[in-house]
Amino acid sequence: MVEKDFIGSKGIKVSGTSSWEAPSNIALVKYWGKFGNQYPQNPSLSFTLSKCVSQTSVSFTERLKAGSDFSFDFSFEGKPTPSFHPKIESFFQRIDQYVPFLKDHHLSIKSKNSFPHSSGIASSASGMSALALCILSIEKEGCPDISESFFLKKASFLARLGSGSAARSVEGPLVTWGSSESFEDSSNFYGTAINSEIHSVFKNYRDTILLIDKGQKKVSSTVGHNLMNNHLYAATRFKQAHENTALLKSILASGDLDAFVSLVESEALTLHALMMASNPYFILMHPNTLEVLNKVWDYRNTNNSALCFTLDAGANVHLLYPDSESESVIKFIKEELASYCQNGQFIEDQIGNGAKKL
């Protein structure tokens, strides 16, 4: 499919409300670096989460006179939140040609997260995905012949224009985004649920998120992505990501947990090494992040465990482990790792199946 395939019909005029719940996700093979209209420089592959979700409701009413601007109001956690308006306005400008009926309507948007907004967990993926799904549901109401397959592709396509990683928050439990020889139907335009063989051990995998720092990052992901444009190691990294995507596909089929641990942790540390080797350079890990990583390594060696970590573009740590180890790992977290978390907070989550209509 190409971009023009997603250009929507003009003249759709509907009233009503659409509500969706969309999950966050955690990349195993990392997306870092973009080009053009929110296209990834390399493929990424992620676990869709189950409990860390955004719930969004959009009420559409037809405007008496369509304007050249967008008409909307936004509330978060039940309170009007004008500080979000610039980001939503920018998103609407990016998707305008694909959903040209937006300017014919006033949108009343209400959103909330299942996790604290100030937790340090990136909510843009779940939030933008949920908003895109709500908007596309309205389009489907006006164009009921839209197929389920096309609906999911276009929802991911639109979500990508709000936040790159949001492209991976429509489906589940494992999603790839970015053209890759390893997955025939992969695309730079949208995320795709992985339909190849997945070993049973990964079907109920756990992710406990240690909230090391709940504050705002000193360097945004957008800035970090842009620093890859002239990065000394960019070409090597993009090649590595393609190779790791192919390797991870094989690991997911075989259930080789030793190989999974090695690849996932290498990807996490590579992401932060790229930040430290950028110009200008920056560090998003905190001292407590490193303390946790060393504790995880010690625990794994001592207990013959498959517990491993991954990191997003921040200080928090995602601990990944098989469901069979849940009891022992949670005990370890409470006894030895919670003290490194801000206010002792962590969130227990697991692999999920993607967005759902409410």
Regions found by a protein language model. Name each.
Residues 1-119, 133-149, 332, 347-358:
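ATP-binding N-lobe of GHMP and related small-molecule kinases
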Residues 24, 127-131, 240, 244, ...:
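Catalytic-loop motifs flanking and including active-site residues across diverse enzymes
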Residues 48, 211-213, 310-312:
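Short beta-strand segments
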Residues 61-64, 305-311:
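Short, flexible, solvent-exposed loop/turn segments with mixed acidic/basic and small polar residues
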Residues 106, 310-315:
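Short Gly/Ser/Thr- and Asp/Glu-enriched loop/turn motifs at secondary-structure junctions
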Residues 109, 117-169, 173-176:
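Long, hydrophobic, well-ordered secondary-structure blocks that form the structural core
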Residues 147-301, 305-307, 324-335, 340, ...:
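ATP-dependent small-molecule kinase catalytic core of the GHMP/sugar-kinase superfamily
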Residues 318-322:
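Short hydrophobic/aromatic beta-strand micro-patches
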